[in-house]
Swiss-Prot record:
Lineage, opening ranks: Bacteria, Pseudomonadati, Pseudomonadota, Alphaproteobacteria, Hyphomicrobiales
Organism: Allorhizobium ampelinum (strain ATCC BAA-846 / DSM 112012 / S4) (Agrobacterium vitis (strain S4))
Role played: Isomerase that catalyzes the conversion of deoxy-ribose 1-phosphate (dRib-1-P) and ribose 1-phosphate (Rib-1-P) to deoxy-ribose 5-phosphate (dRib-5-P) and ribose 5-phosphate (Rib-5-P), respectively.
Predominant localisation class: cytoplasm
Matching PANTHER family: PHOSPHOPENTOMUTASE
Chain sites annotated for binding Mn(2+) 1: D10, D346, H347
Keyword Manganese carried by entry: yes
Coiled coil (UniProt feature): none
Molecular function via GO: magnesium ion binding; manganese ion binding; phosphopentomutase activity
Name the record gives this protein: Phosphopentomutase
GO biological process: 2-deoxyribose 1-phosphate catabolic process; 5-phosphoribose 1-diphosphate biosynthetic process; metabolic compound salvage; nucleotide metabolic process
């Protein structure tokens, strides 16, 4: 038997998506633009980082070759390694959305071939009858926001009014989401989570992918900050995923971070919560000591997207990548014969791009472990090849989509 470890560097795209123009993302390249900005000094921040982007361990896994495959150019200021010891390539997304569930479900062998529902860009985002039903079911005096917004901006703008009135802040984005921000102490965390459950139920006919609880603390617009108690309420995947097939085969899926929420806890045998990339890596390393033959350890490293991509923070994103790179030797030391690790992403979120939304990009594939031969696997037609590769490695039946690259 064998073990598999799947790490999603949330939003770490490598550009080059052939359908990017259809999404308004022609030229978006998360890795390439971060490297370009860092090489030009625009990725420097006092006390955080400076200079060209330094990712020696990821580079040794083929990251720069991946960038060349995906976008046609090497990242600025980064030197090719003397040798590559990982299997490497990039993948196109065939799901119609560039959102978190679509990316993760496709990675797990289930592309999203239908259109999500979205809320209008102009005017009130949410239908009046939906708002009325929410307020009635949840006994609310009303809601604030009702618009497309950046989460941090709307918190600064409406957080104090929320604390005065008790009305939750409800907003959306270009993704298929309904987000609800509320103060953990003034409104109450449990009350916020119950509200999200109500909204999730009411949104069934709207085909909205996720309801997201965004709890925060603080006492004024100057110091409001989100807490680690975010919760995602996703619709279930449209058909069984790799996780379901593993569970049916008697294997354990260790779902770390927001993986359980993304899959609506369908096929996720063991949910482990952690807040922030460092804590997520710590939890992952601990589980690597415990995982049995045949298990999958599946971790989402959310900070790249949540803290830096959406906030268009190049120095922050670069520093987070460099920190992750430094953790990789700890992963190597945990590996035993039969292990395979795959690093990938679910979409892009170019921190140099206009707006605050995800970007349509190819994603990297880096696979390594004892017995994994270093080579290029080229550009894959779908993220689902990742899930099929894990299925083949763990010895379970193939799914309907994708092809193993082992």
């Amino acid at each position: 038997m064998a073990r598999a470890f799947l790490f999603v560097l949330d939003s770490f795209g490598v550009g080059g998506a052939p359908d990017a123009p259809a999404y308004g993302d022609d030229g978006a390249d998360t890795l390439g633009h971060i490297a370009e900005f860092c090489a030009a000094g625009a990725g420097d921040r006092d006390g955080l980082r400076a200079g060209p982007l330094m990712l020696p361990n990821l580079s040794a896994l083929g990251l720069l070759q991946i960038a060349s495959l995906a976008s046609g150019s090497l990242p600025a200021g980064m030197a090719l390694p003397e040798r590559v010891f990982g299997l490497y390539g990039a993948a196109n997304e065939i799901s119609r959305g560039k959102d978190t569930p679509s990316g993760h479900w496709e990675i797990a062998g289930t592309p999203v071939m239908f259109d999500w529902g979205y809320f209008p860009q102009e005017g009130d985002a949410f239908p009046a009858d939906l708002v009325a039903d929410i307020c009635k079911r949840a006994d609310l005096p009303g809601i604030l926001g009702n618009c497309h917004a950046s989460g941090t901006d709307i918190l600064a703008r409406l957080g104090e009014e929320h604390c005065r009135t008790g009305q939750p802040i409800c907003y959306t984005s270009s993704d298929s989401v309904f987000q609800i921000a509320a103060h953990e102490h003034v409104f109450g965390l449990e009350r916020l989570l119950r509200l999200c459950e109500i909204v999730r139920e009411l949104l069934t006919p709207y085909r909205i992918g996720r309801v997201i609880a965004r709890p925060f603390i603080g006492n004024s617009a100057s110091n409001f900050q989100r807490t680690g108690n975010r919760r995602d309420y996703s619709v279930p995947p449209p058909e069984p995923t790799l996780l379901d097939r593993l569970s049916e085969a008697g294997r354990t899926v260790h779902a770390i971070g927001k993986i359980g929420d993304i899959f609506a806890h369908q096929g996720t045998g063991r949910d482990i919560k952690a807040n922030g990339n460092a804590a997520l890596m710590e939890a992952t390393l601990a589980v690597m000591d415990e995982a049995a033959d045949g298990d999958l350890v599946f971790t989402n490293f959310v900070d790249f997207d949540m803290l830096y991509g959406h906030r268009r923070d190049v120095p922050g994103y670069a520093a987070a990548l460099e920190a992750f790179d430094l953790w990789l030797p700890d992963v190597y030391r945990k590996l035993i014969p039969g292990d395979m690790v795959i690093l990938t992403a679910d979409h892009g979120c170019d921190p140099t791009w206009r707006g605050t939304d995800h970007t349509r990009e190819r994603v990297p594939i880096m696979a390594f472990g004892p017995g994994i031969r270093a080579r290029s696997i080229g550009i894959r037609d779908t993220y689902a090849d990742i899930g099929e590769t894990i299925a083949a490695h763990l010895g379970i039946a193939p799914g309907r989509h994708g092809m193993s690259f082992l």
